[in-house]
Amino acid sequence: MTGFEIFKKKYQVIQILNEINNNLEERLISIAKDKSGKLCVLKEIKYLNNKKKLEEFKKEEKNEEGIQKRIYQRNFNLEFNHLKNFSQMNHTSIIKYIEHIESKDEFGLVDRCIFVTEYYEDGDLSSIKEIEFKDIINLFLKMLINLKEFQNVIIHRDIKPENIFLRKFKNNDGKVELDCYLGDYGSAQTLYTQNKSTLIGTNQYIAPEVIEKKGHTNLIDIYSLGKTLLSLSKRNTGFVYNRIYLKLFEIMTNPFETRPNVNQLIEFMCRHHENLKYTLLVSDFQHRDSIKCLNYLKEKLIGILDNKTNPLKKIHIDMEFQGKTYHCNGVLRSEYLRNEYILENYPINNNNNNNNNNNNNNNNNNNNNNNNNNNNNNNNNNNNNNNNNNNNNNNNNNNNNNEGEVVQVIELVSTDEKHYSVLEGHINLSESPILNSLSFHDFKVIRGTAPIMHFNDINTSTTGEEEEEEKKDNLKRQNENNQIEQEDKGEKHLKETLNNNNNNNNNNNNNNNNNNNNNNNNSNYNSNRKCLLVLVPMKNHSFRLYKDILKNADETTVEIIQLKAIFHSLLASYLVSLTGVDFALQFLIRGDGINVYFEPPQPSDTTTSNNGEIKLTDYGFKFLFPFKHVSTVYSECNSTYFDIFPQSIPVKNPLVKEIQQFFKDESQTKIPFTTIFQRLISIVLREEYQYKKYKELEYYFEAFNSIDHHYQQLKINNENLVKSEYITRLIDSKEIIKVVNHLTFMPVDDYFFYVVPHNEKVYGIEVYKNFQDIDFFGHAINIIRLSLAILNDHSKHFKFIDAHKDINSSIYYFVYELPPSLASNYKSTSEIQINNKNNNNFYNNNNNNNNNNNNNNNNNNNSNDKSDNENKLLFKQLINQHFNNCIEFINNINTFAREKNPINILLYSMHTIITKNEMNVSSLYYSYMLFGKVNQCIIGSFYDIGKWVYGDQFEKKIKSATFLKNLQYLVWYKMSMISNNHHQVYFSLSNLYSILNEDDKDMMILNLESSLKINENNENEESLPQKLFKLDDIEFGDNFKYSKILIGGICYYILNIKEGDIFKEDQFGLEKKILLLELKQLESGKKYLCFRKQSHQTNTLKELKFNCRTINKKINDEIILEPLFVVEDSNVTFHFYEYKSSFENIKSIESYSKDNSTDYNGIVIIRSLLYYIQYYLSNYKNDDDGSDDDNDNDNNRSLKLVLVNMKDNESLIYLDIQYLIYRLYGVDISLTNEWTKINESLINGTPSLITNFIQTNRNKILNDSICLEILSNELMIKFKPIEIEIQREINHVTSVVSVVDVDVSGNSSKKKFVRKAIGSIIDLKIIGKNYGGIDLSNPRSLGTYNLIGDSVFRNISFFENKKLFEKFDTNVNFQKEIEFVKNYSKFLNFDISNRIPREYSILKSIKGMNGVVQIDSWYLENDIIYILMDYFDGQNLLEVSQDLINDFTLFSILNQLSKILFELETVYSIHHRDLKPDNILIKNDLTICLADFGISHFSKELKNDQDLYYSKDGTLGYQSPEIYSSELRGNGDIKNQPYKMDVFGLRCVMKYLMSKFNSSSSKLKELVEKMGFFNYDDRISLKELIECLNKL
């Protein structure tokens, strides 16, 4: 036995991975298992070219010594030797060598070898789809170590993902990380052969110089590694990481002249790891091995860095900005809305800048002044000179001391106006004085419309031809960009400012490089997206708080620094919380130290240690203000931790721990953050005596004492009123303030305040139970505070004190101080004299509780007792008060917007409280409404007051009341429900004044009228009113008499609004209305009747479309009246009709429905529907109709809403087919854009929902001449109802199966059918709402949603609906069916074609087969699905006459049935499963017909579901025994065994007949016994049964 055979016996080959044969060698790679069971990889190689190699050596070498040297070199260069040598190094990441065996030929060359390596079970890099960036960086570092070891030895030549193997492991946090190992050294070569030009490697990873045969150096491995890393970066799972490394990977793929070597790459990675102190915390080096790799590389590089004679040329990724060149240390991108660059100033370029400043101070001063004016518009002319001088000094100082200057550039890009304004608000907050001393404040903000730069625009330092080519490309791009016309003024201004700066630099230096730099700089400003560019200069030696800073510090130093850091965070967080800007807090109080920076002290304030270094305790702290992209800007703070320290820094100080724990406990109660911070400050001051010894904390204690003094005064005044237990004791449920109900879109409970007198003041406490959105609690408090800051009027508005959550229950208390006049009214009487009237929400009149009903009754009685004049006077008084209050409210908003520039301006959203004093004088007060009311309810507030005064008579007494209500709907639908629409609504207080004044010209008082200055002659104005201010999308313009609406770019006066149909049961809790608008065009004065229809609820701007088109009429009669034109988008449709006086009495289908909108079967509705169907069918497109409407993808031009002019001239109905379908069947087809597809099943399908409606009302239709006239049209013939006359019921299942006569030709020619009910669509209303549109043109599709049963697979409604259950005597286990229905949702994912009604599917598939019932058609009536089957004139075997049956006929019956069942099984793959005498029909000529396929199944369906296979369907006494006993089942797999249950059922039928008719045939008895063996394996199959019958 040879050595190789002995060696191979040690391993058992499991799998051959690869086999390679060529002229040079034969390779066999396999997975094997050693004797211990451990997997490994065997690689066996046979070298076939040794003789040729030896000949080459002899030609190239002159002596034997040289030949032997070449032989040794060739043997040493073999793969297993490289692997053996490098894998023994612990620091390398190379596949691990285990052992090998080799043999040599007679020349001394290795001719065969087998070597063994470790097996890596997780595959290679090519197999992973996602990878974290920290794993990519760790891979990079490990490959750099490998390449450093290879540097003077070998070139790998085939680095690629397929040759880097993986091993996954879990770190301490339980997260999966990757270890990588480089393998496959078969292509490796020693540097001895570097001048060779062998083309070896994988195409996409081969360096260009190899392909061009320019020789091999170790730079080709750098290229391959760069390509590998770039391919992996595309699979990165994160979106926040330092993208500067991506640029480095690109540089690694440069041409070899500019490609960095391994030493340069190592130096770059070590340097950039050190520079992390200037960046936000990223996870690039968080892999457990990354720091180890960096430390090793630093040690390897020491000698190279100290080499002064041949210094290492460093890699710099440079960026030019505003005339300076910077080293870019980091690029972080958060999605596409935010880029962040960490820049370090070039020292060489700084000297140039110093010269520029010294020689050209005037130019620089002007430029600096311009920049300051851009960033601060509040500078006045008197201060400009001083500012210029200061700027000069500052700039000169900075330029003299800016070596190593670090600049953080934050680019916030947004394409959305709202997002952009929020970002500007964020900038304004960070510029505010409250954060001046706490954050890096001396930043610059550039506002423009062009992203300043992108990662792909970073210019890397290059040399030679590449640099010249890059300059040419930049100049070319600049020339192209100059030709682009820039429309945006902000962008023009930005470009002019930058050009001025660049031109000055060009004039001073006269340097071509500077010209090119300016061109590059300008080329970055050519985009239409808005952006904010924030430049944050950080002082020299500023650094982030992290572990290494404190590793050598003593305990006292660590304690002082941690206290200063958390005090700094607490002070900043408290100041930010006062502004109500919650989104900033979560980045201040919990950022793992990413935003907290040490700042070096001023030279005069420094204290040095013994070694001359500045003491850490003298460093201050500054926040890098947390600019985040807009997805986080809007969100409130949701952090429950005060954790500003990185996890690597342990917290030991007890005060810091107490602060963190207290914040965690209190923040979970969702009380306002300002309150939490105030209490934390009190905790800090409690320990002040202990920490006074640290002078470094004096500043913070001074600030905290100032804050706490105000807070303690507030606590003394309120005596802890907001504590939940104290509130509970004070509340008296009998003492309440009722709040006037408001116009809102959803039913809510009545609002009220508990009145609490306390400490010489009176408070109102608002209580909320079961807060639905607990995270909104703290955010809501800030909204209230901002609202009250805008109002600033405690005489009319409740003053918010504080809020509290009871930890032990879901109760929230909001405490307000009552206005003084309201409080004095309470204190002056022994009982509450705030006699508010309270009316129920008018949406919910039928669902009120008893208290609400009593309030309504009292209110209505009081109103009836008063005269109309008294009510009128009271209404006038309150409306005047409210108008003046609203004017003041709007003025306050204008003032606040100008002075404060808040992030969000709150709209009107107030509780209305009406009081009456002892002098019978009513007054209005207001409290901010937290829930239940949309912000646009200023219109509805006037309606509320009228509703309070007049009660339910309001809309009858005041004709403008309905208009007010509907105007509020119109505004609300524009604003709250769908913000993305093409139309706009305009109104003003003067408009509301005019509306109410139509009822009474003396309604308003003079001072109000004079203050409004209404323009009565503005009806013909040509332009929109000048905007005074804007709240979201509602425009409050100049005073005008009429409200206005802008539709499709045309402005109309709103003369009147009527309410149309309402989708009351909308699944989102909303009511999608049709509003009837009477409009007057401003320019032409034409009047229109416009139907505004809300269709969808899409808020995505991309789905918004505008389409204004004139309808092409296909029928031109006077029945269906189409609009003149339609303006529509994806959400709203406007149908415009030329206004006529006859339109005053337009009605909807609701006017003709019976029993309070529950019956839509009236003859007028039936006629309208038939007219519409005729109209719909006549409006299909024709290919030759000349239409070029590319926007209309439907095949039908008909509209969903039309006017129907009834022939009797008694009514004009607007018919919305979607609304009618919704009312009839609960299917909201407006939720889908597939209008034609839906209508094909609703209308054009036969049968369909419409045919169901027609068939249900057939008696009314057949007795109405107008309906018959409509149905006589050739398009409508198929909709004519079927005339059915029931002859008799099949007794065993009452009302389910009947014999009927059907008029099939329409001429009273009747044909007999068997009609069977197989399901129902009663549940369609619920199903349609929950699951969307349903195709009803195919009955099989109904089964997925509606038709589930167990015994006969009937509809759910058979078991859930009592009436239907009583109607059909199903003889099934009711409880069992209910349990079956509970699993209803499981069926939604099943294949529709194989589901119920299965009987219909089966009968359709066997149509034409002899011996089975034949289906004719199906139809819908009264929501029941019926099938019609050909009538079989015979008897069933249960009722068959005794004269017909004998032994001969029994053999005939058995023979026919066995063949029918065999054909069903073999040809159609169907099993009947319910064989019994009732289901077998026979004629006098002994012809057999098999019926009732209600529980039949397709074979595939049965054999894929064992539970279904052995289900207990069918009839007891005829079921196979293996259904009930598993012991009797066959031993084989049900998928492969024949189905024998029908054989057993047939045996039971024959047994019944043989017993009933006294059969004496022994052969028949013997055969039937074989059919009836209880054990499945013993029973004969259908095939065997037929063979036995053929032998008889």
Swiss-Prot record:
<feature type="domain" description="Protein kinase 1">
    <location>
        <begin position="1"/>
        <end position="302"/>
    </location>
</feature>
<feature type="domain" description="Protein kinase 2">
    <location>
        <begin position="1342"/>
        <end position="1592"/>
    </location>
</feature>
<dbReference type="InterPro" id="IPR008271">
    <property type="entry name" value="Ser/Thr_kinase_AS"/>
</dbReference>
<feature type="region of interest" description="Disordered">
    <location>
        <begin position="348"/>
        <end position="402"/>
    </location>
</feature>
<dbReference type="GO" id="GO:0004674">
    <property type="term" value="F:protein serine/threonine kinase activity"/>
</dbReference>
<dbReference type="InterPro" id="IPR000719">
    <property type="entry name" value="Prot_kinase_dom"/>
</dbReference>
<keyword id="KW-0418">Kinase</keyword>
<feature type="compositionally biased region" description="Low complexity">
    <location>
        <begin position="499"/>
        <end position="526"/>
    </location>
</feature>
<keyword id="KW-0677">Repeat</keyword>
<feature type="coiled-coil region">
    <location>
        <begin position="461"/>
        <end position="518"/>
    </location>
</feature>
<feature type="binding site">
    <location>
        <begin position="1348"/>
        <end position="1356"/>
    </location>
    <ligand>
        <name>ATP</name>
    </ligand>
</feature>
<feature type="binding site">
    <location>
        <begin position="2"/>
        <end position="10"/>
    </location>
    <ligand>
        <name>ATP</name>
    </ligand>
</feature>
<keyword id="KW-0547">Nucleotide-binding</keyword>
<feature type="binding site">
    <location>
        <position position="43"/>
    </location>
    <ligand>
        <name>ATP</name>
    </ligand>
</feature>
<dbReference type="GO" id="GO:0106310">
    <property type="term" value="F:protein serine kinase activity"/>
</dbReference>
<feature type="region of interest" description="Disordered">
    <location>
        <begin position="455"/>
        <end position="526"/>
    </location>
</feature>
<feature type="region of interest" description="Disordered">
    <location>
        <begin position="837"/>
        <end position="867"/>
    </location>
</feature>
<protein>
    <recommendedName>
        <fullName>Probable serine/threonine-protein kinase DDB_G0293958</fullName>
        <ecNumber>2.7.11.1</ecNumber>
    </recommendedName>
</protein>
<dbReference type="InterPro" id="IPR011009">
    <property type="entry name" value="Kinase-like_dom_sf"/>
</dbReference>
<comment type="similarity">
    <text>Belongs to the protein kinase superfamily. Ser/Thr protein kinase family.</text>
</comment>
<feature type="compositionally biased region" description="Low complexity">
    <location>
        <begin position="837"/>
        <end position="864"/>
    </location>
</feature>
<feature type="compositionally biased region" description="Basic and acidic residues">
    <location>
        <begin position="486"/>
        <end position="496"/>
    </location>
</feature>
<keyword id="KW-0175">Coiled coil</keyword>
<feature type="active site" description="Proton acceptor">
    <location>
        <position position="158"/>
    </location>
</feature>
<dbReference type="Pfam" id="PF00069">
    <property type="entry name" value="Pkinase"/>
</dbReference>
<keyword id="KW-0067">ATP-binding</keyword>
<feature type="binding site">
    <location>
        <position position="1376"/>
    </location>
    <ligand>
        <name>ATP</name>
    </ligand>
</feature>
<dbReference type="GO" id="GO:0005524">
    <property type="term" value="F:ATP binding"/>
</dbReference>
<feature type="active site" description="Proton acceptor">
    <location>
        <position position="1474"/>
    </location>
</feature>
<feature type="compositionally biased region" description="Low complexity">
    <location>
        <begin position="349"/>
        <end position="402"/>
    </location>
</feature>
<keyword id="KW-0808">Transferase</keyword>
<keyword id="KW-0723">Serine/threonine-protein kinase</keyword>
